[in-house]
């Protein structure tokens, strides 16, 4: 009996592992409309690669690499979660909340936002000088991040 239960558990585990396989595409058409709109409104570069992350056959996330090296992650509905650009560019203004942009301009003149992560509690911003900042959802500065 133990062998049967073990075999069933192994088969079930293999099924879940197989259904979690990520897929890749070289075309923006696999992205939700919201993600395609975000890219076209904020970036000049074209989509190079789209990684579609799945768990148990369900899409969890889209990771997009653009031809200029920028990387953007979107949730299954096409809402962006984070974005990074190469160190010679800046994250597009459409990704940076007004309060965040104003704080960076006032307190870190001469730097650029090269990375931004969005989560339930707010934003984490990486500057071109390597400093990381935390902001709440309204764009108010909270602290420097380690």
Regions found by a protein language model. Give the residues of each.
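Bacterial Sec-dependent N-terminal signal peptides
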Residues: 1-23, 39
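Structural motif
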Residues: 21, 87-88
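Amphipathic N-proximal alpha-helical interface segments
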Residues: 60-86, 130-146
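Glycine- and aromatic-enriched low-complexity segments, predominantly in secreted/extracellular proteins
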Residues: 22-24, 29, 146
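Exposed beta-strand-loop-beta-strand "reactive/processing" segments of non-cytosolic proteins
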Residues: 47-72, 117-133
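Short, non-transmembrane alpha-helical segments in secretory-pathway proteins
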Residues: 26-49, 91-112
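Generic detector of low-complexity/intrinsically disordered segments
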Residues: 8-16, 33, 60, 68
């Amino acid at each position: 009996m133990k062998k049967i239960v073990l075999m069933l558990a192994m088969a079930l585990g293999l099924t879940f592992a197989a259904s979690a396989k990520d897929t890749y595409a070289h075309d923006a058409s696999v992205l939700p409309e919201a993600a395609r709109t975000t890219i076209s409104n904020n970036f000049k570069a074209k989509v190079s690669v789209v990684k579609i992350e799945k768990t148990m056959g369900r899409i969890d996330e889209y990771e997009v690499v653009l031809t200029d090296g920028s990387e953007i992650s979107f949730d299954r509905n096409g809402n962006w979660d984070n974005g990074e650009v190469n160190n010679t560019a800046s994250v597009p203004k459409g990704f940076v909340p007004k309060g965040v942009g104003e704080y960076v301009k006032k307190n870190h003149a001469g730097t650029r936002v090269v990375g931004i992560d969005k989560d339930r509690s707010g934003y984490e911003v990486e500057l071109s000088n390597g400093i990381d900042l935390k902001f709440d959802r309204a764009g108010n500065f909270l602290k420097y991040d380690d």
